[in-house]
């Protein structure tokens, strides 16, 4: 199994914790799934902590420090603030897989919006009260399929 690593020269907008966490992850040869199981989080949420896009709880910091053998004080210092979300990827993205996700929204965004509005009314799907997961399916022909589930609380627009 290949593991996700980080080339900091390609990601200058990431926080210092990203380099610390990815270096330890590579040294331990852990997948995000393994780390997530240890800290009790979803693997996408765990990866988001590594990329500075999610806030680590004090318990997350303790568990990450223990598992990855990083001094807890270092992680407390690097992960104690609030994430500066949205700065890690230039728009439009250049990385092919991230661009495909962007392209899905470009191609199907209005279709998603229309169907969601018909089902729920005028509003938006929250990215705050939100969860996501990634699964792998293999069909009868042996083809692998990526299944990405997005689950967000529906927030109706208020009338004023």
From Swiss-Prot:
Reaction catalyzed: cyanate + hydrogencarbonate + 3 H(+) = NH4(+) + 2 CO2
SUPFAM superfamilies (alphabetical): Cyanase C-terminal domain (SSF55234), lambda repressor-like DNA-binding domains (SSF47413)
Swiss-Prot/TrEMBL keywords: Lyase
Top-tier EC class: lyase
One Pfam family hit: Cyanate_lyase
Recorded family membership: Belongs to the cyanase family.
Official protein name in the record: Cyanate hydratase
Name of the coding gene: cyn1
């Amino acid at each position: 199994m290949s593991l996700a690593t980080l080339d900091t020269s390609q990601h200058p907008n990431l926080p210092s914790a990203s380099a610390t966490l990815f270096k330890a992850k590579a040294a331990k040869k852990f997948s995000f799934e393994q780390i997530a199981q240890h800290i009790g989080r979803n693997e996408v949420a765990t990866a988001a902590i590594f990329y500075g896009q999610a806030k680590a709880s004090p318990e997350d910091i303790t568990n990450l420090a223990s598992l990855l053998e990083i001094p807890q004080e270092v992680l407390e210092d690097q992960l104690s603030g609030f994430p500066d979300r949205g700065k890690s990827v230039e728009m439009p993205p250049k990385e092919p897989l991230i661009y495909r996700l962007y392209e899905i929204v470009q191609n199907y965004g209005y279709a998603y919006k229309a169907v969601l509005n018909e089902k729920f009314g005028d509003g938006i799907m929250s990215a705050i009260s939100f969860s996501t997961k990634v699964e792998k399916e293999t069909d009868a022909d042996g083809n692998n399929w990526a299944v990405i589930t997005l689950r967000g609380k529906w927030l109706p627009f208020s009338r004023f």
